[in-house]
């Protein structure tokens, strides 16, 4: 039975039983705590937790899942895969243990003619949690399993959770006995190769807390209702029904292995374990890579992008180790498409993009591999020569940091070479580099010589931010710092560098730079007896995420620790910043509406009148896409959507659909910004407008690449957008006036002028080349003879480029016949004594036979014009810095020819 048929039967079985079929979610979700979807129930978590009401009582799906913790084990055994399909049925307070067991047993054992899988009931076993007598009794009652085929296991095996806080519960697993060829008798507790787990029925009834292993977490209490979450391994059922020993022999992975075998000189399953591992790595990782790219992941250096990059690079290197020297990744992606396309149409519809991204990574990594492999061989040789078998952490770090060689690849190659790597030393050097980078960034940003100076204030409690409600606040000075050192008082004229003076207040309306929004500017003024004190706030930064540091320029009076002050944010600046920040949310929403949910935020910057938004995307946007994004954004602005901000528990906010940045750490309670209901909802601590119309027009300036798989959109907002459009309108009017055409005809007229200019430039180039050729004829005719050598040594016009000189010496040399001949040309610069002097020397074969090689003769030219040069015996070139020495250079050349020739 083919895999697509196994999938179809599963879904049909549960739909017939009243379940709603739900499509697979993407393997990436807007959850910063989850790298990839790793279970079928992930998209249903809000229903299990009672945070949202499910639109159906029961559901069924086949979820794409990715698990990469065991990536290094893939291929070594046939049990590990990074991608798998989890077929599941789910009940949200409807049926419980009996229903789950009855439905699973029926599908597994019903005949093929009746829509089942037709498995032999005598080969099926079940496990239950230690004290789950109810489940054990149901297996005996519903399935007729004898007691010796129902085994009890502890939390590590039969109590399920996602590995993070969330729903959990006891489980019951179904196993298939593959027979004595795969191991001894005794059931799953004895051998899980012979007894293969195919289905896990989770009785989801509790919520778990934090913990690092499968057994050390706390059960927080019962869920609002009892639920069912099951997961059947589609690939495992396929290997049973297809009668093959492992998943790599099934119809989804075997075609990839066959493709590789057709390209590799050594076949699969020929008794070479190392080669078989490489075949399996290619098969598994190619499939996972295609799925990831289809769901919007691009190769990168961290997070999901790094996992994809690592998968593709393991594929490429495994192919190299199989002696496949030609590009193969494109063919692999096509094979995955053909095998998986019937189940996942996006692999076919998005085939060109998937192929383009994967092949680009192959091309880039082949360059790294070529240079890095040579360097590793040198390191390995030096390691052995020193009498040790451990590649130093320093060498591994150099390979990684200087030459881009991944540590995982160094580890693999070292193992293959019989060496190990000081991975601890490598990690420490990486940590040191990160610490240096953070310290450098902090020094550049904060100019804090010693953060311990602020510790007392940090420990005393956070700064109260009042800026969401007011722009002016009364406050008290908690601390004054000059050049990072705490002082009791600071006065006008005491410090000339505004960035060296910092005031810490107990409360402030000035926004500290964070979340992409730059800091407010404003003033801090004294009160009472200190009313003459005034400081301009030029920047506000945070220390330890809780303490606001106001960088100031003291303009008058003095500030004393403990004094009362009035802090005020510049209203115009704040308005512009909020327009920019709200505009960023609008552009983000428009991007996802036009490009799809894979356009995930990677960074942003908002300042008055301007926004910059970085997002994960492969390849440039089309003009049509840019136009659509701009139009969707401005339509939302004109719709005058209400902007709501509120605080919510993190899990509830995510369940509402609030977007979070992957890799960002959030507190339990977060601030949510909602614009226009479902149009935009994000976790955000920034300041925002009250309604979307207050943003004003948004004009996208451009879109560009800022790294592999990351694009950047820049835009003007509000009045700056209007001013930009006004400038463009004036520019267009000026062009129309100069060209004497209506504005709408300017593009066509400019295009026409450009074509005419190109034609004129071509004509000029033809004339110049004709002049060069004529110069060659004239120069050859005027050749002088020194001994047996014919010599053309001339000073040429300043219009001659180095390329012209090379062409010319070749032409002249060809016209001088077979006698010994040398040509030396120097272009006289037009810019005076400070100009560069280019020169070229050519020598024919006969001259070289006399010892007059161009690479030697050029040294005599170079010395006289304070230059350098080099090349081969037939042609050499260089440049000097001393135009006054041109005549002497040519004479020096003549003297050398006279001496030798």
UniProtKB/Swiss-Prot annotation:
Amino-acid positions noted as binding Zn(2+) in the UniProt annotation, renumbered to this chain: 581, 585, 684, 688
A GO molecular function assigned to this protein is: zinc ion binding
Q: Which GO terms describe its cellular component?
A: cytosol
> Where does it localize?
Cytoplasm
* EC number of this enzyme: 6.1.1.7
GO BP, one annotated term: alanyl-tRNA aminoacylation
Keywords assigned by UniProt, alphabetized: Aminoacyl-tRNA synthetase, ATP-binding, Cytoplasm, Ligase, Metal-binding, Nucleotide-binding, Protein biosynthesis, RNA-binding, tRNA-binding, Zinc
Q: What is its main location?
A: cytoplasm
Query: Which InterPro entries does the record associate with it?
Result: aa-tRNA-synth_II/BPL/LPL, Ala-tRNA-lgiase_IIc, Ala-tRNA-ligase_IIc_anticod-bd, Ala-tRNA-synth_IIc_core, Ala-tRNA-synth_IIc_N, Ala-tRNA_ligase, Ala_tRNA_ligase_euk/bac, DHHA1_dom
> Catalytic activity, per the record?
tRNA(Ala) + L-alanine + ATP = L-alanyl-tRNA(Ala) + AMP + diphosphate
The annotation note on the cofactor reads: Binds 1 zinc ion per subunit.
Q: Does the keyword Glycosyltransferase apply?
A: no
Q: Which domain of life is it from?
A: Bacteria
Q: Which cofactor does it need?
A: Zn(2+)
Domain comment text? Consists of three domains; the N-terminal catalytic domain, the editing domain and the C-terminal C-Ala domain. The editing domain removes incorrectly charged amino acids, while the C-Ala domain, along with tRNA(Ala), serves as a bridge to cooperatively bring together the editing and aminoacylation centers thus stimulating deacylation of misacylated tRNAs.
Q: What does this protein do?
A: Catalyzes the attachment of alanine to tRNA(Ala) in a two-step reaction: alanine is first activated by ATP to form Ala-AMP and then transferred to the acceptor end of tRNA(Ala). Also edits incorrectly charged Ser-tRNA(Ala) and Gly-tRNA(Ala) via its editing domain.
What family is this protein classified in? Belongs to the class-II aminoacyl-tRNA synthetase family.
Name by which UniProt lists this protein: Alanine--tRNA ligase
């Amino acid at each position: 039975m083919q895999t697509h048929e196994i999938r179809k039967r599963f879904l049909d079985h549960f739909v017939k039983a009243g379940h709603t079929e739900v499509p697979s979610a993407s393997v990436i979700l807007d959850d910063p705590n989850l790298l990839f979807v790793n279970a079928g129930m992930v998209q249903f978590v809000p229903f299990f937790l009672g945070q949202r009401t499910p639109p159906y009582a029961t559901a069924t799906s086949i979820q794409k899942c990715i698990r990469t913790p065991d990536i290094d084990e893939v291929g070594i055994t046939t049990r590990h895969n990074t991608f798998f399909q989890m077929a599941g049925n789910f009940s949200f307070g409807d049926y419980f243990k009996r229903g789950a067991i009855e439905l699973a047993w029926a599908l597994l054992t019903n005949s093929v003619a009746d829509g089942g899988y037709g498995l032999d009931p005598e080969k099926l076993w079940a496990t239950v949690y230690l004290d789950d007598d109810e489940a054990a009794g149901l297996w005996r009652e519903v399935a007729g399993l004898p007691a010796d085929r129902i085994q009890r296991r502890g939390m590590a095996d039969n109590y399920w959770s996602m590995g993070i806080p969330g729903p959990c519960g006891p489980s019951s697993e179904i196993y298939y006995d593959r027979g004595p060829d795969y191991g001894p008798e005794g059931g799953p507790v004895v051998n899980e190769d012979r007894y293969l787990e195919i289905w896990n029925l989770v009785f989801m009834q509790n919520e778990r807390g934090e913990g690092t292993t499968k057994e050390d977490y706390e059960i927080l209490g019962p869920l609002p209702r009892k639920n069912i979450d099951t997961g059947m391994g589609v690939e495992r059922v396929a290997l049973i029904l297809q009668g093959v020993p492992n998943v790599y022999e099934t119809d989804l992975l075997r075609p990839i292995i066959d493709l590789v075998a057709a390209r590799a000189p050594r076949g699969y399953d020929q008794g070479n374990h190392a080669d078989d591992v490489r075949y399996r790595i290619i098969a598994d990782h190619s499939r996972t890579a295609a799925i990831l790219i289809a769901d919007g992941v691009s190769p990168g250096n961290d997070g999901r992008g790094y996992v994809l990059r690592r998968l593709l690079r393991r594929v490429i290197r495994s192919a190299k180790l199989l002696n496949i020297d030609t590009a193969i990744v494109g063919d692999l992606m096509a094979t995955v498409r053909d095998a998986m396309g019937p189940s996942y149409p996006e692999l076919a519809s998005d085939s060109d993009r998937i192929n383009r991204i994967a092949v680009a990574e192959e091309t880039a990594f082949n360059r790294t591999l070529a240079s890095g492999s040579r360097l590793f061989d040198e390191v390995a040789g030096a390691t052995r020569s020193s009498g040790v078998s451990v590649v130093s952490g320093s060498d591994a770090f150099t390979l990684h940091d200087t030459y881009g060689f991944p540590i995982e690849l160094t580890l693999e190659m070292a193992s293959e070479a019989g060496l190990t790597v000081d991975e601890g030393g490598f990690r420490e050097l990486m940590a040191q580099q990160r610490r240096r980078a953070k310290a450098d960034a902090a020094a550049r940003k904060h100019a804090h010589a010693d953060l311990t100076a602020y510790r007392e204030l940090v420990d005393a409690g956070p700064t109260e931010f009042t800026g969401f409600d007011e722009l002016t606040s009364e406050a008290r000075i908690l601390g004054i710092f000059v050049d990072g050192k705490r002082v009791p008082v600071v006065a006008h004229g005491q410090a000339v560098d505004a960035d060296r003076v910092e005031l810490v207040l107990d409360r402030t309306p000035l926004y500290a730079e964070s979340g992409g929004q730059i800091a407010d500017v404003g003033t801090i003024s004294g009160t009472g007896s200190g009313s003459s004190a005034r400081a301009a706030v030029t920047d506000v930064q945070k220390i330890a995420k809780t303490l606001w540091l106001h960088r100031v320029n003291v303009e008058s009076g003095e500030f004393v620790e403990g004094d009362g002050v009035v802090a005020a944010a510049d209203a115009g600046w704040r308005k512009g910043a909020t327009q920019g920040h709200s505009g960023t949310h609008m552009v983000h929403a428009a991007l996802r509406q036009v490009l799809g949910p894979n356009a995930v935020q990677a960074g942003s910057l908002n300042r008055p009148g301007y926004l910059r938004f970085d997002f994960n995307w492969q390849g440039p946007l089309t003009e049509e896409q840019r136009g659509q994004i701009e139009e969707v954004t401005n339509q939302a602005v004109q719709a005058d959507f209400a902007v709501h901000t509120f605080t919510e528990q993190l899990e509830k906010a995510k369940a509402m659909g609030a977007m979070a940045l992957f890799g960002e750490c959030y507190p339990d309670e977060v601030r949510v910004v909602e614009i226009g209901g479902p149009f935009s909802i994000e976790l955000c601590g920034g300041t925002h407008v009250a309604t979307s119309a207050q943003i004003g027009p948004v004009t996208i300036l451009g879109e560009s690449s800022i790294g592999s798989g990351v694009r950047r959109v820049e835009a003007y907002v509000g009045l700056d957008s209007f001013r930009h459009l006004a400038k463009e309108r004036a520019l267009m009017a000026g062009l129309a006036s100069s060209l004497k055409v209506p504005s709408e005809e300017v593009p066509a007229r400019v295009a026409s002028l450009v074509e005419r200019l190109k034609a004129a430039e071509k004509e000029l180039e033809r004339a110049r080349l004709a002049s060069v050729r004529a110069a060659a004829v004239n120069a050859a005719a005027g050749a002088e003879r020194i001994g047996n050598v014919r010599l053309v040594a001339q000073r040429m016009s300043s219009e001659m480029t180095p390329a012209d000189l090379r062409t010319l010496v070749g032409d002249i040399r060809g016209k001088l016949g077979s006698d010994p001949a040398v040509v030396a040309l120097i272009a006289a610069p037009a810019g005076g004594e400070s100009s560069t002097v280019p020169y070229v020397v050519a020598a024919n074969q006969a001259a070289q036979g006399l010892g007059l090689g161009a690479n030697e003769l050029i040294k005599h030219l170079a010395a006289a014009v304070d230059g350098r040069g080099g090349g081969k015996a037939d042609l050499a070139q260089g440049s000097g810095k001393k135009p006054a020495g041109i005549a002497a250079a040519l004479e020096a050349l003549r003297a050398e020819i006279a001496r030798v020739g």
